[in-house]
């Protein structure tokens, strides 16, 4: 048995996904000139076991769903350029085809947080005596 075991969950596809994420982030920051993707952040990349596809999840700082859909379209159209640029840095026989997905998780989280804050404020208005006595159930 080898003394140098790789940690669980860090197999070849994980390493390739990590490398793709880093390289795509660099490409978006320095190589893409389209302003619709300037604020895009690569959140996650998952690669198929045979390395034929990479699912790329991104967010846009301070943008809405409409801007996200537009950026997804731009990135999809630029996927050929991005894939060929990736091929130069990846140490694989083939370069995965890129599929871009706008990740709405941050917007959903902010919306849920806002709803919770509003509900708590409304609850405080309806039961102000709890705030005075410190009886928060």
Curated annotation (Swiss-Prot):
Subcellular localization(s) per the UniProt record: Cytoplasm
Alphabetical keyword list: Cytoplasm, Ribosome biogenesis
UniProt protein name: Ribosome-binding factor A
Organism annotation: Alcanivorax borkumensis (strain ATCC 700651 / DSM 11573 / NCIMB 13689 / SK2)
Superkingdom of this protein's organism: Bacteria
Region spans: Disordered: 114-137
Family designation: Belongs to the RbfA family.
Lineage: Bacteria, Pseudomonadati, Pseudomonadota, Gammaproteobacteria, Oceanospirillales
An example Gene Ontology CC term for this record: cytosol
Compositional bias annotation for Basic and acidic residues: 117-127
PANTHER family: RIBOSOME-BINDING FACTOR A, CHLOROPLASTIC-RELATED
Gene responsible for this protein: rbfA
Functional summary from the UniProt entry: One of several proteins that assist in the late maturation steps of the functional core of the 30S ribosomal subunit. Associates with free 30S ribosomal subunits (but not with 30S subunits that are part of 70S ribosomes or polysomes). Required for efficient processing of 16S rRNA. May interact with the 5'-terminal helix region of 16S rRNA.
A single GO molecular function term of this UniProt record: ribosomal small subunit binding
Subunit structure: Monomer. Binds 30S ribosomal subunits, but not 50S ribosomal subunits or 70S ribosomes.
Biased composition (Acidic residues): 128-137
Biological processes per GO annotation: maturation of SSU-rRNA
Classification via Pfam families: RBFA (PF02033)
Alphabetized HAMAP family for the sequence: RbfA (MF_00003)
């Amino acid at each position: 048995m080898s003394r140098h075991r790789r940690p669980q969950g860090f197999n070849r596809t994980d390493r390739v996904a990590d490398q793709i994420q880093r390289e795509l982030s660099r490409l978006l920051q320095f190589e893409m000139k389209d302003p619709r993707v300037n604020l895009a952040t690569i959140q996650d990349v998952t690669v198929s076991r045979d390395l034929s596809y990479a699912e790329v999840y991104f967010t846009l700082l301070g943008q809405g769903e409409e801007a996200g859909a537009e950026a997804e379209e731009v990135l999809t159209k630029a996927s050929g350029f991005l894939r060929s640029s990736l091929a130069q840095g990846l140490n694989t026989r083939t370069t995965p085809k890129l599929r871009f997905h706008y990740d709405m998780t941050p917007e959903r989280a902010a919306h849920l947080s806002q709803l919770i804050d509003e509900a708590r404020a409304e609850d405080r208005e309806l039961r102000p005596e709890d705030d005075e006595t410190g009886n928060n159930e």
